Amino acid sequence: MTVAVLIGTTKGAFVMRDDGKRGDWTITGPHCDGWPINHVVGDPHSGQIWAAGGNGWNGAGVWRSQDGGQTWALSKLSNGDMDRWIKSDPEAARIFGVTEVEDAPFTGDLEALWSISSAHGRLYAGGKPGMLFSSDDDGKSWQGVEGINAHAERENWQGGGAGLTLHTILRDDKDPAKLWIGISAAGIFASEDGGATWETRNRRSNEDAAAFHIHAHEDGLTHGSDTEIGSCVHNMIHAGDNLIYQQNHHGTYRSTDGGRSWSAITEGLPSTFGFPIAVHPHDPATIWVVPMNGDMQGRYPPDACAKVWKSTNSGETWTAMTDGLPAQNCFFTVLRQAMAVDQMDTPGVYFGTNSGSIFASFDGGQSWSEPARHLPTVLSVETLTY
């Protein structure tokens, strides 16, 4: 079997492939014309790869490769400032070698895409500001999911530090009608009818409240309550059936009922703050997180010492993993989508940093190597095992 590590960065997508033994890696890129790529996923059956991204200049879109990342085609969902400039000055655009494109369907509504998911023959893509789209033709065309895009509570949603972003999309392996999304900072939403209707799922379990549930943020507002966790969800991972793990702005959580209630599993970690969370593909009780020192303290590893924390009992206890990671003067950030595992029997664990490194472990996190460095800021890491 071969593993491909799919990397989204501020300067395009990269693909890192192994030699079949995860010992010798090659990397290609940057792909996607240097667009900022927030998320890259692949289909192990067809080999297709999709990269979602964009910004105010480029617009928003999904790049698709049908040959493992060698060539790419763009499906644009919204136009950007560059497209307006091309229309206003076609002669200058010709000199720079760019050509006018057709008006994209969601121009004026959508700024960028932040997440993409492939399952059951359908793609979903999440965007900014807090929008969801679907495609049934491998990403060639896209439709808005109005159940969330026209949600009755939408006018009350508040954005996180990066704005109102729909950054996480979870799918149920068995039931294509079930999905969960995370929006910063509106919270978690779930649908069981293919996206037609949605309900919020931010309720705490009935356990006693911990101090970090109720958080006075720098904006002067209180986040979380005696009955709800804070709505600034950073990342979620589906571990099968109704088991979901979540890294929140204000702690790490576990749900055993499909997100209908959340129990805190932060005790034992050095911080309530972090971005990614990953789960073992064959053992739903094994998870990894990378805590940062806090939202206002620099967002780097506590004590400037890189550590990946692992639990083998669904978050009841945690163990720090440090071998091979920077032990001092480490000020990188690991962003919300920048950690993943492959599907091998002994899965590889990978994470990327905003300083451009990819770290990998092939023994469950006990030891780490750095198979890639000096990349642009790493925004996402996913794997494709085939």
Regions found by a protein language model. Name each.
Residues 1-386:
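Extracellular glycan-interacting surfaces
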